[in-house]
A protein has these predicted regions:
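Anaerobic metallocofactor- and corrinoid-dependent redox/one-carbon enzyme cores
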Residues: 26-30
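Conserved, mostly hydrophobic/aromatic
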Residues: 16, 36, 114
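Conserved functional loop/turn residues at catalytic and ligand-binding sites
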Residues: 40, 110, 166
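Active-site beta->alpha loop and helix N-cap motifs at the rims of alpha/beta catalytic domains
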Residues: 43, 48-161
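Short glycine-rich loop/turn motifs that provide flexible caps or phosphate-binding loops at active sites
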Residues: 15-16, 46
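N-terminal amphipathic alpha-helix/helix-capping segment at the start of soluble metabolic enzymes
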Residues: 1-15, 22
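Ligand/cofactor pocket segment of small-molecule handling proteins
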Residues: 167-171
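A short, Lys/Arg-enriched amphipathic alpha-helix followed by its capping loop at the start of a domain
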Residues: 32-41
Length: 171
């Protein structure tokens, strides 16, 4: 991991999707992207990448590469998605199915970063996935959840593991 200056990530659509099932009107998404660009926000997390659900969820619940490709994204914005580590680690699907759903990025790809939400016991399994994504020129981040429930020694141990990986961001 490299030490860099402070970066701002906006996750309004991803986080706000809990209120409307990630079903934002296209016009709102594009106006939002223009506003983020005008505000000089560099990183925008458009939504999650979930497996298909039995209930209706809007496009920002799946944030497929094909959906992102249809958006008018200002040049300086870096677009990303969030993936819950449990969705890929606890799923009984084959590795090829998981790769197809979660990591099927075209060569010319508008998604430039993936942020994983992880519990401490998931991090060592997600780091190799981050390393693979880095080979595709995708910036990777791990968000350590429920950190207040973790001992200082465990935080130190997992931080060293992250620091010795190709992971770009760990917090």
């Amino acid at each position: 991991m490299k030490k860099n200056k402070l970066k701002i990530l906006d996750c309004t659509l991803r986080d706000g999707g809990y209120y409307n099932n990630w079903d934002f009107p296209r016009e709102l998404i594009e106006e939002y992207l223009q506003a983020m660009s005008a505000a000089k926000i560099e990183y925008v997390e458009l939504g999650f990448r979930f497996f298909k659900k039995d209930i209706y969820l809007g496009p920002c619940a799946y944030t497929t590469s094909s959906f992102v490709e249809t958006l008018n994204i200002p040049k300086k914005l870096k677009i990303g998605i969030m993936i819950n580590a449990k969705d890929i680690l606890s799923n009984k699907l084959s590795k090829s199915k998981i790769k197809k759903v979660f990591f099927n990025f075209p060569k010319k790809n508008k998604i430039s970063f993936v942020r994983f939400a992880c519990h401490i016991n998931e991090i060592s399994k997600i780091i190799p996935i981050c390393n693979e994504l880095n080979k595709q020129k995708i910036t990777t981040a791990i968000n350590l959840m429920q950190i207040s429930e973790i001992s200082d020694s465990e935080i130190e141990r997992i931080s060293k593991l992250a620091a010795n990986s190709k992971l770009d961001i760990f917090y």
